[in-house]
Amino acid sequence: TAPIYKKGVPMPKGGEACGKNPLGRAHHDKMSPEATAMVIEREPEKFQAVGVFTGPRSEGLVILDVDANLGAVEAKWGKNLAQAPRITSPKKAAAKFLFTVPQELWTEVSDISLAASGEGWEVLWGRQGLLNGAYPAGGTYTLEGDLNAIPEAPGWLVEHMKQSLKAKNDKKVTKQGRDGRWSMRS
């Protein structure tokens, strides 16, 4: 877990927090929920939310982050989503759903950006996501469900994540296959 800086507070290395920035050491140290809670309790004017890192670092936690079109996503995959812990914010038509990816698949999957999905959702894998506390635009995140009973990611989600990794690898091969030193010469 990671304590999240309150939106608008000064960051240690300059700039202003956006409300999603984790405490710097949380990038390198594995902080327990208790350690995160202690940081927030000691400096509530500075830290007001809890984040979590996804992927192998968190035993395979993956977050399906629906930023728009929640109704369409629930119509398509609602049966699987109903079993997962759900995090909502004041933002309409949005929610986050928590799953785990089995360890044997960790090297076969990747995150998916909002733009890449094209459907108003993204997949957080190897990245950080907010779970609880202050929502950057005002209000708070609300958790429904049991964090001790996070289900395995459904097949369709794992397949999307596998396709994302394949697309990224194909793109790297394509870029590496060209020698740009000669392309602009006449």
Q: Residues of each region from the PLM?
A:
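Conserved phosphate/metal-binding and DNA-contacting active-site motifs used
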Residues: T1-R185
